[in-house]
């Protein structure tokens, strides 16, 4: 069967009603794009943007010495080729990294005699090795010391300005106190806050507070500048005895008129006394031409002057700026003949006097005093000078080296405060500070909004690239100090750049980050889904983030802006709930680190197919329709009013007001949650468990894709990177279990390409979680594959679809109490058919070291062991592949020299006579630990460079080399064949210009005759250059070109493979003191057994309680026994009804499969099968596909479908109940999906009908074999002498206080005494007991438990004199 037919995505019947607008973005692009932006490898050095690694270098360099006579400048960086490839790094325990070289320039200056001029004396440019930088693999992971790790993206508070209030909790009066905080990317924090007296204070770096005006004065502003910036002024006029003020419409709103406002021309009263100036009244006044409003002198008393009021005749200041005007002062102003002056507009309703009050309590006058005051607060104890104060203040907020808002911070500041500062200005400006304070004062006065710190516009994502950029910056700053010191200590003119640069501090920081940072995690490799989810995880924890203990409820909660960006379902249970989240399906991260989600644009009530990505801030204020809002075929909304989201609320809006629409219903949830069919029918808590448990599903021996899926299975399998995907279009040349060779189509590759793809498959490799990674080909020889097709399945994938569990026939009914409380009753059939058998691979390592007493040796010659024990070891002391081992068996034989003991003269004599005996070595072989039983599937040996190789190493090397040579020969063969076919096309039928003879003198090509295909086939290809065509130079040129390209390609292939073989034979880099290292891999087959944990996809989990013989299971009318019996009581209270709908739809899918099987068995006509399939699918595209199939292809499709027709019920747009009923009808089942079951033991029918169907059930990684544990004797704790605890320590079972009570209640005194003494920490007693058992006696002589001695010592250490008095018996 043509591969493309078997693998056609159309075979999964899809219930989706909404057309797909855009494809789901690659699921691991978040990792790959971030690292790509960080390295900018595909950009030439001179064209690189100021971001990532380039930005770090440019921000730290140039480095100048203290006297500024030399500077070290950065030019560019480049990366070399990694020493080992990914596979080798895995095997050798190395880091997959590339060497980095940085080109730097050392410029030395001559300082001239003229002040502040200098000339260049010398410039030296050099490329300096700068350590290694880890590279990301194709799948978005890093390989550090041989293990795959993932850098989790961090969700942290975005830099910018944030306004908040204390909710009235700070002061006892319950007054709401507002505050503002400016958070930079790096640098000092700036806080402004009001106290309960409405005075505005500022804190720098959370130090002691001071009046905010101190900071503003330090910025160079005077008191009157500040007052006039924060307050508006009113102009007051004396007109004889009358007092008037200028009618400013902006200030008049909501003020009251002191006296009637009358139009002097008509005498009409426009505003009555004590009435407010409304907008209508102000407009009326303007129409009547009233420019001045009469006021009373009482209104003016208590107002504040906004400028100095000066006597025009003498120049004397009558009232200073910020002075309160009293009755007397006003009289004085009037008497001096000052007719106009200005006062601050403060009405204590909409404008309060808080800022003016702050100026009053601030006793500092000048900018210099303000600078010194700030210096005193930040550096208490240091004597302040104006110069040091100024330099400290400049460095705080205005020096790009010390303070960085980042582009994001600047963007947020501009957005919040309405500024137009360019984005490349990344320090604070004076205007920024003023505007921050202005907004805070407005906020207090009731204008503006406080910020919600959980809004995704105020939180951003730091992905791998940015996290690593910060580490590099830390490392470079450390290196900068060292370089400056070196420049000052040595003569710079004699130095080269490499003498100054030591990259060790940088490498150390990066190494530490990858090795031990909280965000660098051991990849969860249980199955493909867990890998993908791990790479898409967002964590609020980690350096610079939150801590579990301090995180409150708000941070963890779901926020309206999470919609389409962060999954509201998938998060861990336990202390990290809500702090670790997962990116939604369609979400992506923009250049500023904000999470964006796609929307379709709506224009005039019509939805378009144009898609744009919006961040949470950009989305604010838009009306967004749901993806399932009803539209007609032209894209117009059907309803007049549509439910939409706007600014975090659900509202009904008219269709013309809609601006955006969701692209898909599943855009809300993450990848794991989108794999749960009928998610919309599950309770959210159970859905959370379901999405978490899918990540723990163990890859099974036989992958089986779900009958009821969601359509996401193919996407996850494709993007996870576990399956092998075709790189080019081509035809499969050869296939075996471990490699696939594809000959590329001619139009696919250029002249330089080899024209052949060889895919070496991964066979039985060990994952991080000890599960088995194995790839199996799904193509056959002759299949034509297209670029992007899956050609080999990986773990947990089936025909390119994710397959985490098995489709099993389940019945919901109680059965003999074996499914009480979530227990699961399973049929022995599942065990017999290996449906839930999984392979786990354990790695054991043995190291031979060079010790002080001599070298350890790996050998089969071990003293005091019988032949039976050593039967499976080869002569090198390593176990053979295929050996079945049990706990205690030797895997690698190793002997270690013993310390020399003093020998007696007699022993020395005997030793001199009989030679050295084997007494000076001890057996330190690697043995199989308890609980491990399996088959040896591999061994790897690493020897020091230059050391002699043992037989086993040579054997392994030969096998590897043979594999490489086979690849080499296949590549050469295929490109030769393609060259030959091209040449034949050119030459056959053309007239030969020269004759060509064979080695025996026989003429193969006759001059002047047409060249035949047989003649060409008889000539070896290396002699084809002798062939020439008459009167056709262009053909000759083409032939020569093809032959020369062929030879070049063959040379390249040989060179590449020779290099690989060389690498293979080279010794290994081992840690100091290690002579040889051997790793042995054991495959353990785990069948399903009682105690294993299983789960569905809806959070329905349970433990296998009994495995029942097939014949005892309840069976259907046709005699088929069910495979699993679940408890119906597990559904109602948990509210995960999705599992029942899945069971019904699975039952229909299975039933349709049985119908097809019946048709095939009866050899029904193909048209009948085709009609039935068309009926089932009811899909135009599928009908078209079925019509293109011939009988054989149709029968192959039918065979594939007889196990059940796979269905996709996508999240939030899945099959309706009617849809399920329709499918049940087509399968020939009752609409209730309930059947009569019969008891397997008695054969009687059960009283009630039972819900039966097919459910997808997973086996989780919590296997009973890993948990069961027993101990007789083992290690003891040093202090208490009690057995250690836990399986890993081979510990004992704790017998605590409550258990002692139980024993006491039963009066089991002797048993209890035994428990508390010889079985625990009575050292002497347990030794006596051991000896007694060896001698065959069974006496119990308990002594004093060691814990009693510990207690006495503790009391003595507290200074209490406790003595133990022994009763001497007479």
From Swiss-Prot:
One of its GO terms (cellular component) is DNA-directed RNA polymerase complex. One of its GO terms (molecular function) is DNA binding. This is DNA-directed RNA polymerase subunit beta. PANTHER family: DNA-DIRECTED RNA POLYMERASE I SUBUNIT 2. Belongs to the RNA polymerase beta chain family. It comes from Geotalea daltonii (strain DSM 22248 / JCM 15807 / FRC-32) (Geobacter daltonii). Gene3D superfamilies: 2.40.50.100, 2.40.50.150, 3.90.1100.10, DNA-directed RNA polymerase, beta subunit, external 1 domain (2.30.150.10), DNA-directed RNA polymerase, subunit 2, domain 6 (2.40.270.10), RNA polymerase alpha subunit dimerisation domain (3.90.1800.10), RNA polymerase Rpb2, domain 2 (3.90.1110.10). The RNAP catalytic core consists of 2 alpha, 1 beta, 1 beta' and 1 omega subunit. When a sigma factor is associated with the core the holoenzyme is formed, which can initiate transcription. The keyword Transcription applies. The lineage of its organism: Bacteria, Pseudomonadati, Thermodesulfobacteriota, Desulfuromonadia, Geobacterales.
């Amino acid at each position: 069967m043509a591969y493309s037919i078997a693998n056609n995505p159309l075979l999964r019947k899809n219930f989706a009603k909404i057309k797909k607008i855009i494809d789901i973005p690659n699921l691991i692009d978040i990792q790959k794009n971030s690292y790509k932006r960080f390295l900018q490898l595909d950009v030439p050095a001179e064209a690189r943007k100021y971001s990532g690694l380039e930005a770090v270098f440019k921000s730290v360099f140039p480095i100048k010495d203290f006297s500024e006579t030399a500077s070290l400048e950065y030019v560019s960086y480049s990366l070399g080729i990694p020493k080992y490839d990914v596979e080798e790094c895995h095997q050798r325990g190395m880091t997959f990294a590339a060497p980095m070289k940085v080109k730097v320039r050392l410029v030395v200056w001559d300082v001239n005699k003229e002040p502040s001029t200098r000339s260049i004396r010398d410039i030296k440019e050099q490329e300096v090795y700068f350590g290694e930088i880890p590279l990301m693999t194709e799948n978005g992971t890093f390989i550090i010391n041989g293990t795959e790790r993932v850098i989790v993206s961090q969700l942290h508070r975005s830099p910018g300005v944030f306004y908040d209030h204390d909710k009235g909790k700070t002061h006892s009066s319950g007054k709401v106190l507002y505050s503002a905080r400016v958070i930079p990317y790096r640098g000092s924090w700036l806080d402004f806050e009001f106290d309960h007296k409405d005075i505005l204070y500022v804190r720098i770096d959370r130090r002691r507070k001071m009046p905010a005006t101190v900071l503003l004065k330090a910025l160079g502003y005077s008191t009157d500048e500040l007052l006039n910036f924060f307050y508006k002024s009113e102009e007051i006029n004396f007109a004889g005895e009358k007092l008037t003020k200028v009618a400013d419409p902006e200030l008049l709103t909501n003020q009251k008129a002191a006296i009637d406002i009358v139009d002097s021309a008509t005498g009409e009263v426009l505003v009555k006394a004590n009435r407010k100036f409304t907008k209508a009244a102000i407009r009326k006044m303007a129409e009547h031409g009233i420019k001045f409003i009469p006021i009373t002198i009482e209104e003016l008393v208590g107002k504040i002057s906004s400028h100095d009021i000066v006597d025009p005749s003498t120049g004397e200041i009558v009232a200073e700026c910020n002075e309160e005007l009293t009755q007397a002062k006003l009289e004085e102003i009037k008497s001096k003949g000052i007719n106009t002056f200005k006062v601050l507009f403060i009405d204590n309703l909409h404008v309060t006097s808080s800022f003016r009050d702050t100026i009053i309590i601030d006793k500092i006058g000048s900018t210099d005093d303000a600078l010194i005051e700030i210096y005193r607060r930040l550096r208490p104890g240091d004597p302040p000078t104006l110069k040091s104060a100024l330099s400290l203040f400049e460095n705080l907020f205005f020096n790009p080296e010390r303070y960085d808002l980042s582009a994001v911070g600047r963007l947020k500041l501009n957005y919040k405060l309405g500024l137009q500062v360019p984005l490349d200005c990344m320090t604070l400006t004076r205007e920024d500070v003023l505007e921050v304070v202005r907004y805070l004062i407005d906020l207090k006065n009731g204008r503006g909004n406080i910020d919600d710190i959980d809004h995704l516009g105020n939180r951003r994502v730091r992905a791998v690239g940015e996290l690593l950029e910060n580490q590099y910056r830390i490392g470079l700053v450390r290196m900068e100090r060292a370089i400056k010191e070196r420049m000052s200590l040595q003569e710079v003119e004699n130095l080269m750049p490499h003498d100054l640069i030591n990259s060790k501090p940088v490498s150390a920081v990066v190494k530490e980050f990858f090795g031990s940072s909280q965000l660098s995690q051991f990849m969860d490799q249980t199955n493909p889904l867990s890998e993908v989810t791990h790479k898409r995880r967002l964590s609020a924890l980690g350096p610079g983030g939150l801590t579990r203990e301090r995180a409150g409820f708000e941070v963890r909660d779901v926020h309206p802006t999470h919609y389409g960006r962060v999954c509201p379902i998938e998060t861990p249970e336990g202390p990290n709930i809500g702090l670790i989240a997962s990116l939604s399906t369609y979400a992506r991260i923009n250049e500023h680190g904000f999470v964006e989600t796609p929307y379709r644009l709506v224009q005039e009530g019509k939805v378009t197919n144009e898609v744009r990505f919006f961040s949470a801030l950009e989305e604010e204020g838009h009306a967004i329709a749901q993806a399932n809002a009803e539209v007609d075929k032209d894209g117009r909304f059907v309803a007049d009013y549509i439910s939409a989201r706007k600014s975090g609320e659900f509202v009904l809006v008219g269709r013309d007001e809609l601006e955006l629409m969701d692209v898909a219903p599943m855009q809300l949830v993450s990848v794991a949650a989108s794999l749960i069919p009928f998610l919309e029918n599950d309770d959210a808590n159970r859905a959370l468990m379901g999405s978490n448990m899918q990540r723990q599903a163990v890859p099974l021996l036989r992958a089986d894709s779900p009958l009821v899926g969601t359509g996401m299975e193919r996407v996850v399998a494709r993007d996870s990177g576990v399956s092998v995907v075709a790189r080019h279009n081509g035809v499969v040349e050869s296939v075996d279990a471990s490699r696939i060779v594809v000959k590329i189509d001619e139009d696919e590759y250029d002249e330089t390409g080899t024209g052949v793809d060889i895919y070496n498959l991964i066979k039985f490799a060990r994952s991080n979680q000890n599960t088995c990674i194995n790839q199996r080909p799904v193509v056959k020889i002759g299949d034509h594959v297209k670029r992007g097709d899956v050609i080999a399945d990986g773990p947990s994938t089936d025909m390119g679809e994710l397959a985490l569990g098995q489709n099993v026939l389940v019945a919901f009914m109680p059965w003999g109490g074996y499914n009480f409380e979530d227990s699961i009753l399973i049929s022995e059939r599942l065990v017999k058919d290996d449906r839930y058998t999984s392979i786990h691979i354990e790695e054991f390592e043995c190291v031979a070291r060079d010790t002080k007493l001599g070298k350890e040796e790996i050998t089969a010659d071990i003293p005091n062991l019988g032949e039976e024990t050593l039967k499976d070891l080869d002569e090198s002391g390593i176990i053979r592949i295929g050996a079945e081992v049990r706990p205690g068996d030797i895997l690698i034989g190793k002997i270690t020299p013993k310390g020399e003991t003093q020998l007696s003269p007699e022993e020395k004599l005997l030793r001199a006579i009989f030679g050295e005996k084997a007494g000076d070595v001890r057996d330190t072989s690697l043995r199989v630990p308890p609980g491990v039983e399996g088959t040896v599937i591999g061994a790897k040996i690493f020897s020091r460079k230059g050391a002699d190789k043992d037989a086993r190493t040579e054997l392994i090397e030969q096998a590897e080399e043979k594999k490489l040579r086979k690849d080499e020969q296949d590549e050469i063969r295929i490109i030769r064949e393609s060259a030959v076919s091209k040449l034949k096309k050119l030459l056959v039928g053309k007239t030969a210009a020269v004759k060509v003879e064979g080695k025996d003198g026989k003429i193969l090509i006759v001059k002047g005759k047409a060249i035949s295909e047989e003649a060409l086939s008889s000539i070896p290809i290396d002699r084809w250059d002798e062939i020439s065509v008459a009167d056709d130079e262009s053909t000759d040129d083409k032939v020569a070109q093809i032959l020369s390209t062929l030879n070049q390609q063959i040379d390249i292939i040989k060179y590449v493979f020779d290099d690989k073989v060389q690498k293979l034979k080279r010794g290994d880099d081992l840690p100091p003191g290690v002579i040889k290292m051997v790793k042995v891999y054991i495959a353990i087959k785990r069948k399903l057994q009682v105690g294993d944990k299983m789960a569905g996809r809806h959070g329905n989990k349970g433990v296998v309680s009994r495995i029942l013989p097939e014949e005892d299971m309840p069976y259907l009318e046709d005699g088929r026994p069910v495979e699993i019996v679940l408890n119906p009581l597990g559904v109602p209270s948990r509210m995960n009804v999705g599992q029942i709908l899945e069971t019904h739809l699975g039952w229909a899918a299975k039933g349709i499969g049985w119908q097809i099987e019946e048709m095939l068995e009866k050899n029904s006509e193909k048209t009948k099968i085709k009609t039935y399939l068309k009926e089932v699918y009811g899909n135009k595209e599928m009908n078209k596909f079925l019509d293109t199939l011939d009988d054989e292809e149709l029968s192959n499709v039918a065979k594939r479908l007889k196990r059940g027709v796979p269905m996709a019920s996508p999240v939030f747009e899945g099959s309706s109940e009617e849809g399920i009923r329709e499918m049940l009808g087509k399968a020939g089942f009752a609409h209730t999906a309930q059947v009569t079951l019969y008891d397997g033991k008695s054969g009687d029918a059960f009283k009630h009908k039972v819900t039966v169907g097919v459910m997808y059930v997973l086996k989780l990684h919590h296997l009973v074999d890993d948990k069961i544990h027993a101990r007789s004797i083992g290690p003891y704790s040093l202090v208490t002498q009690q057995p250690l605890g836990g399986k890993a320590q081979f510990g004992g079972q704790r017998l605590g206080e409550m258990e002692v009570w139980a024993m006491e209640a039963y009066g089991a005194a002797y048993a209890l005494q035994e428990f508390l003494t010889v079985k625990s920490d009575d050292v002497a007693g347990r030794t006596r007991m051991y000896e007694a058992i060896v001698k065959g006696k069974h006496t119990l002589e308990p002594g004093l438990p060691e814990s009693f001695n510990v207690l006495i010592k503790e009391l003595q250490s507290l200074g209490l004199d406790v003595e133990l008095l022994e009763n001497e018996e007479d």
